Amino acid sequence: MVKVANKYAKALFDVSLDTNNLETINEELTVINEAVKDKIEQLKMVDSNPTQTAEQRRELINGVFIDINPYIKNMMYVLADNRHISLIADVFKAFQSLYNGHYNQDFATIESTYELSQEELDKIVKLVTQQTKLSKVIVDTKINPDLIGGFRVKVGTTVLDGSVRNDLVQLQRKFRRVN
């Protein structure tokens, strides 16, 4: 189903670029995703209900999403017609990936054993942007005492691990190779 969501996201992304609505659509899609992320199971029930017609699913869209961008509403209608309303979170993720790629930015999760100061965060973000060649890094921080010390950064599938725990694991592997 991820491939299906990617197609919807790509179509919406292309339309948003063509109509100079990329920022507006991204903002509205973010709000919609937040609103429905805990309701995916109910949306799956709507999708799989054989007695509900496409028109009834469209009425649901109209009732829930009153003042949304017409391009998003049209995409929601297509999702409803094809019994894919429950894919909205996957569509959002795929759209967000396209959006981030367009602006050469990505999300980064920075884990450390304590709350980092703004100066420390700025240094880590600078390091991450240099390592990943991204223009912008959107940061989420987490405290992880298992790291023992240092920090670990996850950007997409890339992990930059400067933690004491990682150093100990690497040292342990070297000792195993020697023995």
Swiss-Prot record:
Major place of residence? membrane
Q: What does this protein do?
A: F(1)F(0) ATP synthase produces ATP from ADP in the presence of a proton or sodium gradient. F-type ATPases consist of two structural domains, F(1) containing the extramembraneous catalytic core and F(0) containing the membrane proton channel, linked together by a central stalk and a peripheral stalk. During catalysis, ATP synthesis in the catalytic domain of F(1) is coupled via a rotary mechanism of the central stalk subunits to proton translocation.
Q: Quick one: which gene encodes this?
A: atpH
Q: How does it sit in the membrane?
A: Peripheral membrane protein
Give one Pfam family: OSCP
GO function term, MF aspect, one: proton-transporting ATP synthase activity, rotational mechanism
Could you tell me where this protein is found in the cell? Cell membrane
Q: What does the record list as coiled-coil region(s)?
A: none
The protein in question is named ATP synthase subunit delta
* Annotated InterPro entries: ATP_synth_OSCP/delta_N_sf, ATPase_OSCP/d_CS, ATPase_OSCP/dsu
- The answer to whether keyword Ion transport applies is yes
Gene3D superfamilies linked to this entry: N-terminal domain of the delta subunit of the F1F0-ATP synthase
Q: What's in the GO CC field?
A: plasma membrane; proton-transporting ATP synthase complex
Keywords (alphabetical) are: ATP synthesis, Cell membrane, CF(1), Hydrogen ion transport, Ion transport, Membrane, Transport
The protein's organism comes out as Staphylococcus aureus (strain bovine RF122 / ET3-1)
PROSITE patterns from the entry?
Answer: ATPASE_DELTA
Q: Which family does it belong to?
A: Belongs to the ATPase delta chain family.
Q: How does it assemble?
A: F-type ATPases have 2 components, F(1) - the catalytic core - and F(0) - the membrane proton channel. F(1) has five subunits: alpha(3), beta(3), gamma(1), delta(1), epsilon(1). F(0) has three main subunits: a(1), b(2) and c(10-14). The alpha and beta chains form an alternating ring which encloses part of the gamma chain. F(1) is attached to F(0) by a central stalk formed by the gamma and epsilon chains, while a peripheral stalk is formed by the delta and b chains.
The answer on whether this UniProt entry bears the keyword Transport reads yes
